[in-house]
Amino acid sequence: MKKTYIGLTCLLLLALALFVALSFYGDSLERWHIKTGSFARVLIGDTTRRQRTPSSATDSTRAVSQAPGQDFSQTVDTARKSILFIGDSMLEGLGPRLAAYAEENGHTLVNVIWYSSTTEVWGRTEKLKEYIAEYQPDYIFVSLGGNELFVSNIRDRRQKYLDNMLSQIGDIPFVWIGPPNWKPDTGINEMLAETLRPGQFYLSYTPDQHYDRARDGAHPTRASASAWMDRVCAWVMRESAHRIVLHRPKAARAHCHTVILAPAK
């Protein structure tokens, strides 16, 4: 009888040892699939759960890589957008490149070029509001300031017009592209930076940004303007207040509906 108990005990110990070994062994034994045992998880903890990579983002949003100190909860709005791009003659170079981005990423784009325009020219009219009503954009780009680099006392003379433009834009997400200075300005960039909210203003005049100039010495060449737009679009996806999909296009430029306004008198 004693030998029988000893034999049963040995068999139980052998079975337990085999169970423990299989629990730690892994996911397969030769060609047989073996589910990792919960016993091993109890002993060493479920390391696979702690080390699991995050699940992919939903279809409506996509996670964006962040620079140090940025909000890691920020996501990209992946919906197709109806974009309105308004501004001065800088749109001649920027517009076709943004059109290529729009075409590549499924957006629609309307460019409105008002030659020689300024914040005052736009802000003393309701033109912006009219174009918003006509084209119903859900995202706006603005490129203004190049004709105001040397305006003295600019806050006293331009702030109210800038405020009126922002009032016309309302709650529509937008990005304001600052001018590509060819000389130091008298305050236009500072006024824009201090008036607009974080992530709404792209400062184009920084030491690390280079511009090849056209014959007038002010406007960037077509190639340089395209590179400028590339930087803006990359910034929109990474750092702007409302990030949209702007993957770099294969085409260098594209056509879109464009409205031309003569210089204001």
Regions inferred by a protein language model and the residue ranges of each:
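N-terminal secretory targeting modules
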Residues: 1-82, 239-265
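Alpha-helical cap/lid subdomain in secreted, periplasmic
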Residues: 2-11, 124-245, 259-260
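Phenylalanine-focused residue identity feature
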Residues: 19, 24, 39, 72, ...
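Short amphipathic alpha-helical segments, especially helix-boundary/capping motifs
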Residues: 71-76, 102-105, 166-169, 204-208
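Conserved SGNH/GDSL esterase-like catalytic core that processes O-acyl groups on lipids
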Residues: 73-158, 183-185
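Mobile, glycine- and charge-enriched loop segments
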Residues: 84-121, 218, 222-265
